[in-house]
């Protein structure tokens, strides 16, 4: 059996990079966790740690996938952190499942492509095409800077104009 041990320092650094690149460093520190989830790439738990730190979870199921999936998941979950800070107790999901209009608008504002799914609300399967070339450069820099190839099975697709993360999973 192969054991995949997440490097929390790398995940923390990647969250910081997403925060800096897309949110001008305005998001608070979070606690990053890795657990198994069959139907989600990650999830957000507001004020889960000592009542003052949010938790972002990344599903262990995807550590054998493309590093891009982790970066987009961190970006997606960071939008939840942003929305919680802006709206307070007002959630951007309904019944902890469906992403609502507040989430959709924040995705548009922070460069994630959004599609609507009747069962799960708004989902972010890829970046906006206008940003994909920029993101591809940033992505390549992150892969090299943090040596992500040793954590993930690198396939490094051409991201421009392609349907990214079309695995049917949700965030």
PLM segments and residue spans:
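Active-site-adjacent structural patch at catalytic or cofactor/ligand-binding sites
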Residues: 56-60, 77-79
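A short, surface-exposed helix-loop junction/capping segment
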Residues: 1-2, 83
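Active-site recognition of the HExxH zinc-binding catalytic motif
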Residues: 72-85
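Surface-exposed beta-strand edges and their flanking turn/coil or helix-capping segments
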Residues: 45-47, 70-73
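Metalloprotease/metallohydrolase-associated module, dominated by Zn2+-dependent proteases
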Residues: 2-52, 60-64, 88-171
